[in-house]
Amino acid sequence: VSFRDYAVDFGTVFFDRGGGDIRQVHLYEKRRGVTSFIGIPYKKNLFSLAYFYEDHDNKTALTAAEKAALNLGIFAGLTGEYKYGDAEKFPASISDENGRSIRLTVNMTNKHLGSGDRNEQVIFSGDWREYVKLYKSHVLALRAAGGMTWGDRLVQGTFGLGGAIGEGTLASGGSYNYFPLRGLPVSALSRTRAMLFSTEYRFPIIEPLRGLGTAPFFLKDISGAIFADYGNAWNAHEGGSDSFKDFFDDFMLGVGAELRGNFIIGHGLPIHGRIGYAIIVLNRDRVERLNDPLLGTSIKYGMLVLALGYAF
């Protein structure tokens, strides 16, 4: 059993007040809930089943009309998940290598399980990652992920696409319904369906294995990565999503590079940090009115990547 109290970033949301008056807000939701779960491992596989009960409310200040337009309140139901992993990692590794990880998730919220009657959905998502060792600690990392939703359409969306939120210690990424596409702000698109393909070439630069005197800080290694993220988020039957011929027309491509480091803080807290640059080079016109939240500049000039945790 676990208890959770956290916030979710839904990115920029626009509220139509009528008469051409559009209000733009950066929407955060606060969530509190309890989860009871069981997991059954078998060799390199893990099967799990959980019941969750969460109360969702706005953290960002909203008017009564704006709050009523969103799908808030109680979300309760079941989550079933399958995971597989056989990737390797050694003391000199900068990344997982020589293997793969797979995750398949089904999430169901229903009023008979305690959910609000506007918050009933069936959500499926999948995530496949391959790590190919090229030479010494050089790695080619590949990822294919996506998700679909059936049932009530949440105004604020189900899947968030965009940003560089990482996974691991002190990082908040890794959720089944978040897809990082670098070159976009966090959850720049939030829809009922999403798809993402990512490729990274990861290479070592230096391995200092040094601390700062007696300070509780240790630098293990510094590495680099060149990456490309290709994805989109959309609602069912939107645009050309029902036609294979037009399906990829609105997909965006973000490319860039990152400098990465593995640190030890205190006496044993491992931290992975990333700093870099990313820019959308395909279908940039879809999001060029958005700004980099760190620099305040238009994302048509690219975005600063500053994050904790592994990209994937």
What positions do the PLM features span?
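Gram-negative/organellar outer-membrane beta-barrel architecture
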Residues: 1-92, 101, 173-179, 187-188, ...
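Active-site/binding-pocket entry motifs
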Residues: 7, 232-233
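Hydrophobic, Leu/Ile/Phe/Ala-enriched alpha-helical segments that form helix-helix packing faces
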Residues: 36-38, 132, 263
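Membrane-spanning beta-strand positions in outer-membrane beta-barrel proteins
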Residues: 46-48, 139-141, 268-272
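C-terminal outer-membrane beta-barrel translocator/porin domains of Gram-negative envelope proteins
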Residues: 73-228, 234-248, 286-300, 304-312
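Short, loop-centered acidic/histidine patches that primarily coordinate divalent metals
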Residues: 227-231, 260-264, 276-280, 311
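C-terminal structured "cap/appendage" subdomains that terminate the fold
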Residues: 245-277
